[in-house]
């Protein structure tokens, strides 16, 4: 059987050596600065000839830090490291595309922290189990 990969975990693993990254839910004792990876949508895309079944996922990456500058820097680094991992083909992810990058706001959960969000589109082959 083939099934979609766990996009959140694949992204977290790709970032593990460079950025403190969590999949939802964010733990109560999270480290700063960090990113939270959340899949917010997805679909199956059968159009890639020669590659097989491909899934696409819309994912948000939320960066949390003590300052605006640190939140932005952490998010920029996470995106850069993820692009590197995708292009080096060391993850199940085949591609990623940055769709939006927000300005910083106060974190609604922890107003003492700054939050910056990016939305990306990723694609990956289905995993066989």
Annotate each predicted stretch with a short phrase.
Residues 1-51, 73, 85-94:
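Small/polar-rich, solvent-exposed N-terminal microdomains that initiate assembly or binding
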Residues 48-54, 108-111:
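Short, solvent-exposed beta-strand/turn "edge" segments of beta-rich domains on protein surfaces
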Residues 53-71, 113-125:
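Oligomerization/assembly interface segments of phage tail-like spikes and tubes
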Residues 65-87:
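Mid-chain, well-packed structural core segment of small domains
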Residues 46, 70, 127-129:
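Intrinsically disordered, low-complexity acidic/polar segments
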Residues 57-59, 69-77, 96-100:
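Low-complexity, flexible helical/coil segments
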Residues 82-129:
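Acidic-leaning, charged glycine-interspersed low-complexity segments
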